[in-house]
């Protein structure tokens, strides 16, 4: 199984010396987990921040086994708010909600659109009223 899609990084965990297991929410495939080889390298670890929009190439031999991601950054959204603790906490909580509530490998474009709108709202001045 091989596909490409736009996604948001919703979580990441160290897997081995130089790899990570990432969980992403894609536009057409829903929540998917995969291994990113070299995910801890200086070259790509800086843009593997939770909440960033990425382009994902997913490969797996079997739908029941974990696959492998090759990724490219589309929009570095989280670094825009590194100096604003409230917005970073908001991003973290929103991505954790998606991680906990979304079903694995089930497409849900409404959630993807809501994540897009969430980052649009976060850029506005009255973001906290719209978020709540």
Residue ranges and their predicted role:
Residues 1-20, 25-132:
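Non-catalytic alpha-helical scaffolds and adjoining flexible linkers that form interface surfaces
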């Amino acid at each position: 199984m091989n596909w490409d899609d736009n996604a948001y990084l919703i979580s990441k965990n160290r897997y081995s010396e130089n790899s990570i297991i990432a969980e992403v929410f894609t536009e057409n495939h829903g929540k998917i987990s995969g291994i990113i080889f070299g995910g801890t390298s200086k070259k790509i670890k800086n843009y593997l921040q939770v909440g960033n929009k990425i382009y994902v190439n997913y490969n797996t031999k079997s739908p029941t086994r974990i696959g492998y991601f090759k990724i490219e950054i589309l929009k570095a959204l989280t670094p825009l708010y590194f100096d604003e603790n409230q917005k970073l906490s908001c991003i973290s909580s929103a991505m954790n909600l998606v991680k906990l509530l979304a079903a694995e490998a089930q497409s849900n474009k409404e959630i993807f659109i809501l994540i897009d709108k969430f980052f649009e709202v976060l850029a506005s001045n009255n973001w906290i009223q719209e978020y709540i």
